[in-house]
A protein has these predicted regions:
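Glycine- and Gly-Pro-enriched alpha-helical subdomains that act as flexible
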Residues: 98-127, 131-133
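Feature captures the catalytic cores and cofactor-binding loops of soluble hydro-lyases/lyases
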Residues: 134-139
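Conserved alpha/beta cores of soluble small-molecule-handling proteins
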Residues: 1-97, 101-104, 141-210
Length: 210
């Protein structure tokens, strides 16, 4: 990874790693004999200043049905439902789509979803086949524990979203990003909330980005 970052002369970068089962004649079954897997690593500039400016304003999200397959915990390149949800968000002037299955928010099209209840509890969907866990999510949980912020990993409903004091999303490219609108409605006062701000600051320090 460091070789790719250095080769592209990048200081702050987003690195993407993709592994496939290798090169072989097209067939759904695995090649026999086995072939070496293919590894592709790419890196692109990460503009922390731009990300920080966006976090000061917050972002808008929309909700969309979660029509993905049943094992989204496996990070694959089959992301058509995610791409369609993301495009739907863009057309409505939003940055992200929160996916909903049976009345519960699972995660974003390209991020994890979080709410802050009026009592100050931070809630995110638990790990399992419904969401793609990641390093950012894991790190934010560690930050919350360090700050002694109560955190629960459980499903949460659209009703809870509507009643929440704060909403935010997390991802490698957004870090901790406050949400100020959902489906055209203001979240709280329509500005980034204090808990999302604290978690973002803690995340930046933990990752030595502050």
């Amino acid at each position: 990874l460091s070789t790719v970052v250095k080769g592209n002369r990048l200081k702050n970068a987003l690195v993407y790693v993709q592994v496939t089962r290798g090169v072989a004649p097209r067939n759904h079954s695995f090649p026999a004999p086995a072939v070496p897997p293919s590894l592709v690593v790419t890196a692109k500039p990460f503009d922390l200043q731009k990300c920080e400016a966006q976090a000061e304003k917050g972002v808008a999200v929309v909700t969309r049905p979660d029509i993905r397959w049943g094992r989204v915990d496996i990070k694959t390149i089959g992301l058509l439902p995610n791409a369609l949800a993301k495009e739907a968000a863009r057309r409505e002037g939003a940055s992200e789509a929160w996916l909903v299955r049976e009345g519960k928010v699972t995660e974003g099209a390209a991020s994890n979803a979080w709410i802050v209840t009026r009592s100050g509890e931070v809630v995110t969907h638990p790990l399992g086949t419904d969401i793609l866990g990641g390093v950012t999510r894991q790190t934010v949980i560690a930050c919350a524990e360090e700050l002694q912020i109560k955190i629960s990993e459980r499903p949460f409903s659209l009703k809870e979203v509507a009643e929440a004091a704060e909403l935010f999303l997390t991802s490698a490219s957004n870090l901790v990003m406050p949400i100020v609108k959902i489906d055209g409605r203001d979240v709280g006062r329509g500005e980034p909330g204090p808990i999302a701000r604290r978690l973002r600051e803690a995340y930046l320090k933990r990752c030595a980005l502050a």
